[in-house]
């Protein structure tokens, strides 16, 4: 993509996602993702209805009048995006690819976090950590993340989600809010996710949510006869007879088994998640995720 085309795309997505983050997600995001807790703000005279547990007895005794401590929510958080940039993200059977969708979802999350005065960072991964952008504030910083979301070129096409989760655990010491944006195509021959151990540790240390980005053709095959399919991560190719009901049913069963295993793993470690497809309205998916928390 030329620099001119990239700038146009960045600007287009910025306008769209910034508007969404202001008009739709601001309140939902604030409610869903809390700050680190309550911080002391000031002492003032007691008013009817104040919680007596917040009485400041030292000041009360000194001034011979009831005073209470006032606390405010520590709103500022660190938000990390863990972005899967492996080869499978280039697939899309409709107007946009999974990488296109990931860029928009990542942008909405970034601008929503920024609107709440949170720092935002990003980690781009394949089967290794390809790039780490430490969390910061500011429009120029957000636009840098957005450019990478749109146009980052990884060195590897393969996937290892555990690498990203381990890096998050080791690099971000304080508890943060983290979003894993991936198609989650990282499983064993028994169709179980390879990243369970790393997920368990990361979810115990950070507030982790998973956004499963997928295309409908990865879950069901169309009935269109012979179809050549390729693995974007290995380069392997094969022909499939999609006119065969048995082939289509076996493929759907395989896909469902993988998704069930992923959902069970996420529930096991109390990780919130959303499934968002390239042909659906991601706004609804994100709002559902926020409201479920």
Predicted feature residues:
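Von Willebrand factor
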Residues: 141-176, 189, 215-216
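A generic local structural motif
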Residues: 66-68, 164-167, 195-197
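Short, electropositive alpha-helical surface patch
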Residues: 133-147, 291-292
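Von Willebrand factor type A / integrin I
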Residues: 1-33, 42, 51, 170-174, ...
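Short amphipathic alpha-helical interaction patches enriched in hydrophobic/aromatic residues
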Residues: 89, 93, 149-153, 270-273
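Well-ordered alpha-helical segments embedded in enzymatic catalytic cores
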Residues: 105, 163-167, 258
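A conditional alpha-helix N-cap/helix-loop micro-motif detector
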Residues: 103, 157-161, 191-192, 255
């Amino acid at each position: 993509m030329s620099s001119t085309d990239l700038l146009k795309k960045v600007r287009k997505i910025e306008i769209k996602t910034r508007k969404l983050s202001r008009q739709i997600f601001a309140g939902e995001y604030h409610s869903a993702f809390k700050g680190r807790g309550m911080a002391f703000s000031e002492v003032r005279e007691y008013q009817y209805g104040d919680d007596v547990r917040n009485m400041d007895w030292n000041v009360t005794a000194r001034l011979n009048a009831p005073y209470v401590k006032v606390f405010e929510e520590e709103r500022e958080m660190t938000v990390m995006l863990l972005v899967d940039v492996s080869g499978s993200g280039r697939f899309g059977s409709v107007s946009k690819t999974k990488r296109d969708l990931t860029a928009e979802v990542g942008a909405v999350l970034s601008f929503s976090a920024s609107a709440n005065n949170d720092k935002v960072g990003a980690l781009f991964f394949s089967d290794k950590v390809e790039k780490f952008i430490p969390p910061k504030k500011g429009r120029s910083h957000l636009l840098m993340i957005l450019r990478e979301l749109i146009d980052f070129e990884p060195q590897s096409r393969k996937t290892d989600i555990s690498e990203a989760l381990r890096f998050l655990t080791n690099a971000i010491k304080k508890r943060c809010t983290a979003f894993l944006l991936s198609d989650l195509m990282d499983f064993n021959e028994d169709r179980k996710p390879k990243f369970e151990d790393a997920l368990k540790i990361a979810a115990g240390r950070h507030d982790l949510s998973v956004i499963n980005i997928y295309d409908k053709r990865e879950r069901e095959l169309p009935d269109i006869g012979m179809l050549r399919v390729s693995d974007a991560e290995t380069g392997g190719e094969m022909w499939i007879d999609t006119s065969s009901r048995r082939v289509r049913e076996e493929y759907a069963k395989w896909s469902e088994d993988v998704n069930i295993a992923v959902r069970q793993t996420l529930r096991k470690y109390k990780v919130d998640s959303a499934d968002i497809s390239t042909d659906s309205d991601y706004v609804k998916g994100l709002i559902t995720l926020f409201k479920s928390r």
